[in-house]
């Protein structure tokens, strides 16, 4: 049985970044501001995990825990990487986690 969640209960959201060419080199002047911005989101208990993709380094994935996708969307809109043109596009997807200690909806067999 899958337990359904009521509105207002935190869920997981993935923020996907598609980066510009030569992203690793071009991010250097903005990295400190981006990391500080991410740490502030962690302190607010919105951002759970984040990091660049590798092989190739052409984007990043950020995991949020929030009541709505707005936390991830607002993060992207003000992220120094986005504001400085390092991210070609971004998108937020709800991630319905079902297995694991931090899963929001647990499957019981």
Q: For each of these PLM feature ranges, what is it?
A:
Residues 2-109:
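Conserved, structured core segments of small domains
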């Amino acid at each position: 049985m899958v337990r359904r969640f009521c509105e207002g209960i935190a869920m997981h959201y993935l923020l996907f970044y598609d980066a510009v060419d030569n992203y690793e080199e071009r991010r250097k002047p903005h990295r400190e501001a981006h990391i500080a911005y991410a740490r502030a989101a962690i302190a607010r208990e919105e951002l759970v995990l984040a990091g660049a993709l590798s092989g190739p380094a052409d984007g990043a994935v950020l995991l949020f825990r929030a009541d709505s996708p707005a936390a991830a969307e607002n993060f992207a809109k003000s992220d120094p990487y986005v504001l400085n043109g390092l991210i070609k596009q971004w998108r937020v997807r709800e991630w319905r986690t079902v297995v694991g200690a931090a899963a929001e909806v647990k499957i019981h067999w």
